[in-house]
Amino acid sequence: MNNSHHRLIKSVSYLSVTTALIILIIKLYAWVVTSSQSILASLIDSMLDITSSFINLVALRFALQPPDHYHRFGHEKMQDLTIFSQSIFFFASAFFVGFASVKSLFIKTKPENISDGTIIMYLCMFLTIILVLYQTYVIKKTGSEIVKADKLHYFTDLLTNVIVIISINLSDYFWFVDPLFGVVISLYIFHSSYSLFKKAFKNLVDHELPEQDRQKIISIVNNHSGVKGMHEMKTRYAAQKAFIQCHLEMDGNISLYSAHKISDEIAFEILQKFPEAEIIIHQDPFGIEEHVNYREYIVR
């Protein structure tokens, strides 16, 4: 990741924290004046947004640092650890919001000062849209997983704002709409949390790349005439950075220079599919079966 990408990611992180803090204060006021359960749900969601944005900002100080003496693989996993932690916070918030909303269904309360609450929520939407548009631009330029996760939080917030506006305006006619929408928001938060949790957990435990990505690597190797077989292919992700290693089987009579050249050509092709990947290729003479734990395939 180059310096311009670093600057973009840092700038969007600062903007994210600032925007989240402003929205949090605005929604807190909206909840005080309306006593709306759906606004409370949205307020809790915003509290998590600012928490996650602050965590992201701190984590990025480490994740964007180049490899050092003690972390020679780099610091990308800090992003996965951050996203994993955020998902746990979101699970907890989804439970809290759902519990409060279900409780309100039995109490039969409805919001007050609906017009004030509506105006305030429109203001929150405007601020969120500006942030999401900038995050989309940064993701397009950098592909940052941590910014993608942050964008998901705020896109969720944008959707919940729409739901909140609808619910508080319908609550004049149907008292149960506001707490019911609070339950819907909590379920949405839970679903989003699970998606983040699943992806971050896979990266943290060094889960293999998706099968379609593995097949891309196999296809590249298979198309090179200098390779007769491949075994011990191991892959993993740390944030958006792929780590790929394998043993290539070649004619045992070719020179070391030729074997090295073939490996470089294959590594170059893989990098076209996986930019910024770290690739380790070991050359083996074809036909030697020692230390082969699993073979991906035999080319010829």
UniProtKB/Swiss-Prot annotation:
Q: What kind of membrane protein is this, topologically? A: Multi-pass membrane protein
In its keyword annotation, does this UniProt entry include Transmembrane helix? yes
Q: Name one GO cellular component term.
A: plasma membrane
Name the residues that span the membrane: 14-34, 39-59, 87-107, 119-139, 170-190
Q: Which gene encodes it?
A: p34
User: What InterPro entries does its record include?
Assistant: Cation_efflux, Cation_efflux_CTD, Cation_efflux_CTD_sf, Cation_efflux_TMD_sf, CDF_Transporter
Return the Pfam families for the record.
Cation_efflux, ZT_dimer
Q: What is this protein called?
A: Protein p34
The species this protein was found in: Rickettsia prowazekii (strain Madrid E)
**Main location as per UniProt:** membrane
Instruction: Indicate the family of this protein.
Output: Belongs to the cation diffusion facilitator (CDF) transporter (TC 2.A.4) family.
Q: Which GO terms describe its molecular function?
A: cadmium ion transmembrane transporter activity; ferrous iron transmembrane transporter activity; zinc efflux antiporter activity
- What does the UniProt keyword field contain? Cell membrane, Membrane, Transmembrane, Transmembrane helix, Transport
Q: Name one GO biological process term.
A: intracellular zinc ion homeostasis
Its annotated compartments are: Cell membrane
